[in-house]
């Protein structure tokens, strides 16, 4: 026979079975959710969630984030913004209206002048154009449209 009884056997006949008479082994003894992170659950939070509590650094109240945000695209990549079919259709029919390439709609604000354009007119819409880009677009008979 074992010399020690298990706790459950010892507690037979005792009404509350070791769980007290008020709480009666119910509800949320440690609090709900993240309760006690700075107090009775501190060890767990420090070990598994370091840096969860507290502040770091100073706050800038009127910070304007990235005012110089200006994605760019070069002339040699400009025709990738419209489909190849569109380019071929307008290359055949040079008398009709020139295709419009909206760089801002594609997420680019400024058009830069690297590369060459095919010899067909095109209307380019953007917020900014470099001097060379504007010259090259106009040299193939196109136009630059500034948009806000």
Swiss-Prot record:
PROSITE patterns: RIBOSOMAL_L15
GO cellular component term of the entry, any: cytosolic large ribosomal subunit
Stretches with biased composition (Basic residues): 1-30
GO biological process assignments: translation
Subcellular location: Cytoplasm
PANTHER family in alphabetical order: 60S RIBOSOMAL PROTEIN L27A (PTHR11721), LARGE RIBOSOMAL SUBUNIT PROTEIN UL15 (PTHR11721:SF3)
Family the entry assigns: Belongs to the universal ribosomal protein uL15 family.
Protein name, per record: Large ribosomal subunit protein uL15
Organism lineage string: Eukaryota, Metazoa, Chordata, Craniata, Vertebrata
Gene that specifies this protein: rpl27a
């Amino acid at each position: 026979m074992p010399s020690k009884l298990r706790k459950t056997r010892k507690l037979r006949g005792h009404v509350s079975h070791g769980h007290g008479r008020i709480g009666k082994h119910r509800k949320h003894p440690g609090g709900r959710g993240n309760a006690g992170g700075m107090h009775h659950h501190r060890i767990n939070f420090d070990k598994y969630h370091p840096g969860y509590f507290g502040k770091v650094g100073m706050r800038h109240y009127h910070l304007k984030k990235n005012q110089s945000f200006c994605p760019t695209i070069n002339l040699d990549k400009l025709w990738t913004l419209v489909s190849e079919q569109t380019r071929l259709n307008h290359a055949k029919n040079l008398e009709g209206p020139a295709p419009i390439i909206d760089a801002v709609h594609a997420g680019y604000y400024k058009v830069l002048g690297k590369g060459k354009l095919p010899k067909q007119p095109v209307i380019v819409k953007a917020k900014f154009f470099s001097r060379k880009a504007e010259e090259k677009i106009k040299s193939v008979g196109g136009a630059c449209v500034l948009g806000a």
